Amino acid sequence: MGLFSFDGGKKESQPPNTRSQRKLCWESRDAFFQCLDKADILDAMDPKNSKSIKSHCKVENEKFEENCAHSWIKYFKEKRVIDFKREQTIKRIEQEAKQRERNQ
């Protein structure tokens, strides 16, 4: 410890970034997202969903937050919403294309 180092008396432990830790993180993420799907919750970052998440997916959320780095958690939650919107847009475009083909 250096003369001027200061950690505020609190150390935040980050899981090591090893292959096995990443695998554990992904498995925890998948279990949490599966629980969200069952509870019909899309956006885990929306404060409106926090009560539902606590009542339906508390254990899965705790494991996810325990096994993944904070930056990964935020990324995965945001990516879930973006991927859903992307899939919906693709479906809509495909349906519109089919409709145009039928009308010709």
Curated annotation (Swiss-Prot):
Subunit and partners: Interacts with COX2.
Region listing for Disordered, in residue ranges: 1-22
Other facts noted in the record for this chain: Present with 721 molecules/cell in log phase SD medium.
Subcellular location: Cytoplasm; Nucleus; Mitochondrion intermembrane space
Family: Belongs to the cytochrome c oxidase subunit 6B family.
Domain-level remarks: The Cx9C/Cx10C motifs are involved in the recognition by the mitochondrial MIA40-ERV1 disulfide relay system and the subsequent transfer of disulfide bonds by dithiol/disulfide exchange reactions to the newly imported protein.
Main location per the UniProt record: cytoplasm
InterPro entries the UniProt entry points to: COA6_fun, COX6B-like, CX6/COA6-like_sf
Effect seen on changing C57A: Loss of function. Localizes correctly to the mitochondrion, but reduces the steady-state level of the protein in the mitochondrial fraction
Gene that this polypeptide is encoded by: COA6
Motif (Cx10C motif): 57-68
Motif segment (Cx9C motif): 25-35
Gene Ontology terms, MF aspect: copper ion binding
Biological process (GO), any one: mitochondrial cytochrome c oxidase assembly
Purpose of the protein: Involved in the maturation of the mitochondrial respiratory chain complex IV subunit MT-CO2/COX2. Thereby, may regulate early steps of complex IV assembly. Mitochondrial respiratory chain complex IV or cytochrome c oxidase is the component of the respiratory chain that catalyzes the transfer of electrons from intermembrane space cytochrome c to molecular oxygen in the matrix and as a consequence contributes to the proton gradient involved in mitochondrial ATP synthesis. May also be required for efficient formation of respiratory supercomplexes comprised of complexes III and IV.
Keyword Nucleus part of the UniProt annotation: yes
Protein name: Cytochrome c oxidase assembly factor 6
Domain of life, source organism: Eukaryota
Record's GO cellular component terms: cytoplasm; mitochondrial intermembrane space; mitochondrion; nucleus
Biological source species: Saccharomyces cerevisiae (strain ATCC 204508 / S288c)
Xref: Pfam families: COX6B
Outcome of mutating W26C: Loss of function. Localizes correctly to the mitochondrion, but severely reduces the steady-state level of the protein in the mitochondrial fraction
Consequence of changing C68A: Loss of function. Localizes correctly to the mitochondrion, but severely reduces the steady-state level of the protein in the mitochondrial fraction
Keyword Transmembrane: no
Domain CHCH, first and last residues per copy: 22-76
Disulfide pairings: C25-C68, C35-C57
